[in-house]
Amino acid sequence: MTASARLDGRQLTGMPALHRECRREFGLPDFYGNNLSALIDCLSGVRDDDGMSRFVLAPGELLDIIVTDADLVRLQAPEVLAALEDVVEEVNLRHAEAGAAPALRLLLR
């Protein structure tokens, strides 16, 4: 099974925009800190039903993070794609360290 979240690449013009889009799409809490550490913390709990995002994954289920218009993001804000890659890597590392399957997959469209 796979759940999916779509980030609109036309809106991803820099890091503040990334945090706005992530807050909206992932359903992050009001106290979300608008930084990558906070994003990693929130998305690390996607299997815990901890209220840190709107997603609750079953064991072994993936959350596909789909970035639309990724070529545009690569041109206008490459740091956003690098940040998303780092977030996915760190969240999946946390899951691996806990003996769980990866939780996130980044898809550039």
Question: Model-flagged regions — what are they?
Answer:
Residues 1-109:
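Positively charged, polar, low-complexity stretches
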